[in-house]
UniProtKB/Swiss-Prot annotation:
SUPFAM superfamilies recorded: Ribosomal protein L6 (SSF56053)
Example of a GO cellular component annotation carried by this entry: cyanelle
Name of this protein: Large ribosomal subunit protein uL6c
Function: Binds 23S rRNA.
Subunit structure: Part of the 50S ribosomal subunit.
UniProt-listed InterPro entries: Ribosomal_uL6-like, Ribosomal_uL6-like_a/b-dom_sf, Ribosomal_uL6_a/b-dom, Ribosomal_uL6_bac-type, Ribosomal_uL6_CS
Compartment list: Plastid, Cyanelle
Keyword Plastid: yes
Keyword Plastid: yes
GO molecular function, one term: rRNA binding
Gene: rpl6
A Pfam family hit: Ribosomal_L6
Keywords (A to Z) from UniProt: Cyanelle, Plastid, Ribonucleoprotein, Ribosomal protein, RNA-binding, rRNA-binding
Length: 179
């Protein structure tokens, strides 16, 4: 049995859950999400808990058991609390600002980089160097954070670029020079 898959998922009182034809739907104070559950996996509601079970003992079902449990847990947590990812910009003259719903990055290119988030995601900029990405879908929040970071990832010599808050960038020593 999967160690992750056999753990129970608590359902907060403000969250309603429905399971119909292998589609798991959850509704909470922050919004509504649904996910297709693969064949061989079943989600069962027991009082105020959810249990993810394997219907079939196939290799695929055993592989997907823990994954489905984590995805269902993320859906429940997303509609109840939401998810947040923070990025920081380091570098002289590097800054970010909001233009309506769009994020405008001035990060050393000859032109500003404009990023338009999906409708489910909210972006905020704190003091021109910190970007906050909020949403109810953990996958979308992480994907957008990775896309923003990929515009100018931190370089190893000076550490300039966009990084996750608290990310440790391995630094390299520059060349030794003439003697």
């Amino acid at each position: 049995m999967s160690r992750i898959g056999k753990r129970l998922i608590n359902i907060p009182s403000q969250v309603t859950v429905s399971i119909k034809d292998q589609v798991f739907s959850v509704k909470g104070p922050k919004g509504e999400l649904s996910k297709q559950i693969p064949y061989g996996i079943q989600v069962v509601q027991q009082n105020d808990h959810l249990v993810v079970e394997r219907v079939a003992e196939s290799l695929l079902a055993r592989k997907l058991h823990g994954l489905c449990r984590t995805l269902v847990s993320n859906l429940v947590q997303g509609v109840f609390q939401g998810f947040e990812r923070r990025l920081e910009i380091q570098g002289v003259g590097y800054r970010a600002q909001m233009d309506g719903k769009k994020l405008v990055l001035n990060i050393g290119f000859s032109h500003p980089v404009v990023i338009e988030p999906p409708t489910e995601i909210q972006l905020q900029v704190e003091n021109n160097t910190n970007i906050i990405i909020k949403g109810i879908d953990k996958e979308l929040v992480g994907k957008l954070a990775a896309e923003i970071r990929a515009v100018r990832p931190p370089e190893p010599y000076k550490g300039k670029g966009i990084r996750y808050l608290g990310e440790n960038v391995k630094r390299k020593v520059g060349k030794a020079g003439k003697k």
